């Protein structure tokens, strides 16, 4: 049995890697959306920079990017440009301890559907025209029609070039 997976699109190899690397470090939006269930969420944003700090402006809500992920300066070419932000469902949560840990990475979203999966709940959310899925604890109080505040783990944010769909930050 092999230890690498080949991800292809239209007969063209996109990435060859271990399952974990495909999941954690996808080379483009296709691979990011292909690996994982539910698939990665993609949100429209604009990359901004204030001093040495980068963030993604999602239309008023700004998700700051950790310094250790941006220190190489590779994002400078994208400042002021539209990007796609990727975040996996398990890296979005409404649990109080998670919220307290990520106070600067929060936004309000509308719960379209709350789906009990047994050991977890999938929240299908709408945020400023973007659809998102959050994988939360079965103790979540969020229900259909609610506006819920959720937080992101900024260390798990991915950025993609909006034109080429190639990864610019994992």
Regions found by a protein language model. Name each.
Residues 49-53, 114-121, 162:
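Short, conserved beta-turn/loop elements at beta-strand boundaries and strand-helix junctions
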Residues 53-55, 59-110, 131, 141-170:
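Glycine/charge-rich catalytic "coupling/switch" loops of P-loop NTPases
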Residues 14, 20, 46-48, 90, ...:
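Conserved positions in beta-strands of structured domains
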Residues 104-113, 117-124:
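Long, well-ordered amphipathic alpha-helical subdomains in the mid-to-C-terminal portions
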Residues 1-62:
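Internal alpha/beta loop-helix hairpins
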